[in-house]
Amino acid sequence: MNNFPRATTALVFAFSLFSGSVAAIAQSTKSTDQTQTTNSTQADSKTTATSQASQPKTTPARSTRPLSTNEDPAMIGKRNINGGIISKMSGSTEKEVRQGREAAAEVDRQAKFIEDPMITEYVNRVGQNIVLHSDAKVPFTINVIDSDEVNAFALPGGFFYVNKGLLLAADNEAELAGVMAHEIAHVAARHAVENQTKASLLEYAALGASIFLGGIPGMIYQNTAGIGLLGIFMKFSRGAEEEADKLGIQYMYAAGYDPGAMATMFEKLEAKNKKKPGFISRAFATHPAPPDRRASALALAARFPEHEEYVISSSEFQRVKAKLLRLSNARATTAGAIQTSDDTG
């Protein structure tokens, strides 16, 4: 559409809203000792020797209730999770990628990126491993934004951005993977594309109402519809967030990660943000999740066939985090020296 470039910034904001992911899940009360193992898909890295230490599981007591097709990790890639009418109206995969690429171009113009290959290759490898074990039908491009703000977002078509602040906030690789799996699930389920389709339908409805009402009353109706209703779709619905939780937990499990780590990461970030408001981005913490959403997500994980071992962390994660900290400290030292020079000059 001709007016898409003008609305690109708004769309980027809409697509990037993490919408409650911080409070997506609560940590389970059950803890059992567990030995971690190297994720087999990460063995392709010539420089990575995964070093793991025992940490407690976070999944609750096992359940024998049968899994539905959309709940079963064994059905990943074999099922259709986009069967709704809105998804069908949202167009082809090619259209999704095209729209995402245009929005990503705006992000690329405005953001500053981490270019250190050790960091970018590691984050890309973790993300691509999850994509490989997901329902996504588009290729993913993953970049690390040089920002201390805790955030991550994925645009339609698989254009995925992870902030440096998120890497620093995670205590292990599984926690990072939990956030990435949730975002990959939003793309796999086409949530942002569906949001845009809903917004377009509302625009058409508002236009029709303005024609029907006519004159100034119609113009007022059109303007309020555009401001109020479109704002509703600049964030994911509770249903979309719950679906991303459940799909993301399946993707973590399939990729070899402890699915409970998603709970610990989001709960940790929520607690830190309560102690220090602004710790995470406003978009990242838009909607606190109710306890039943947390419980249902972890209850689903308890119904998966139990792995003897899960990946929790790796020596490479620790090296990447240490390097990010060194880069951040060096920058802070340089900035302080410049400020001191300015003050004394």
Q: Which residues are covered by each model-predicted region?
A:
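Sec-dependent N-terminal signal peptides
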Residues: M1-T29, Y251
